[in-house]
From Swiss-Prot:
Biased composition (Basic residues): 1-12
SMART domains: FBOX, Kelch
Keyword Zinc: no
Keyword Membrane: no
Organism per entry: Arabidopsis thaliana (Mouse-ear cress)
Name listed for the protein in its UniProt record: F-box/kelch-repeat protein At2g22050
UniProt domain F-box: residue ranges: 28-76
Region called Disordered, residue ranges: 1-29
Keywords associated with the record: Kelch repeat
Length: 259
């Protein structure tokens, strides 16, 4: 074989073999090189449990994951969520260390018949650090917490389940303990009792973000709402349950029936 042919073969082989491209080659297409609206449309379908890992990929992706627009888009997805909170009464321990929040995650089981299984998944929620107990009620995607524990409080705290963040709302006109009864009627939150004196009722409107007082129940029927073990809203009324008695608050009549 002549030297010229050897040289030709050597040159041709060097042209056919290309060095491997490195991962950080700027010429490579990347997910974040797509328009933001396309990236956000993809991210809204990714479970929140993966967001922390996504934030570590790049600054651009971290910015999109933490953007209010992604939170807004997630609220448009058709889904139902159940939030559960467990607490322990431990003296001199901040509430955020003893409150544990969970949501239900549905998992499809691979069986002959299509079945589902649910499990509790822990979610990080920054509970207000100076409170230890609340009455709570949900309206839409937000959970509202009112009243204190043994010490009466007038504060209102709101948990946005879409973002997992707490914010403080306007305070009630009357400070209340956790013995207050809370119910939701027609999208408004009714807080009944929990005061040291006579029963007083306040109504919070999430749309106007304001409180207003209603006519107090008649004194002779207030006993049905003085203390309660639980409360529930049904048929435009708030029912409170205690040992041996059920109290009924009807906002249309602004009064209480006891039986």
């Amino acid at each position: 074989m002549s030297p010229s042919s050897k040289k030709f073969k050597k040159q041709s082989s060097s042209k056919s073999v290309k060095p491997p491209l490195e991962d950080n080659d700027p010429s490579l297409p990347s997910f974040t090189s797509l328009p933001d609206e396309i990236v956000l449309d993809c991210l809204q379908r990714v479970p929140r449990s993966y967001y922390l890992n996504l934030c570590r990929v790049s600054k651009t992706l971290r910015s999109l994951v933490r953007s209010p627009e992604l939170s807004r888009l997630r609220t448009l997805l058709p889904k139902n969520s159940v939030y559960v909170s467990f607490s322990q009464n431990i003296i001199n321990v901040p509430p955020d260390t003893i409150y544990r929040w969970f949501t239900l995650k549905k998992k499809t089981m691979k069986t002959a018949m299509k079945t589902f299984r649910y499990k509790l998944v822990k979610i990080p929620i920054p509970f207000p650090s100076h409170h230890s107990m609340y009455n709570s009620s949900a309206v839409g995607s937000e959970i509202y917490f009112v009243g204190g524990s043994f010490e009466p409080m007038s504060e209102l705290w709101i948990l946005d389940t879409r973002t997992g963040m707490f914010r403080q709302g306007p305070s009630m006109k009357v400070a209340r303990t956790d013995e207050a009864s809370v119910g939701v009627i027609n999208g408004k939150i009714y807080v009944i009792g929990g005061c040291e004196d006579k029963i007083q009722v306040e109504v919070y409107d999430p749309k106007s973000r304001s409180w207003k007082t209603t006519k107090d129940p008649e004194e002779k029927t207030q006993r049905g709402l003085m203390t309660r073990l639980s409360a529930v809203s049904l048929d435009w009324k708030v029912y409170t349950v205690e040992v041996g008695r059920i109290g009924v608050y009807d906002p249309r009549e602004a009064g209480v029936d006891g039986f």
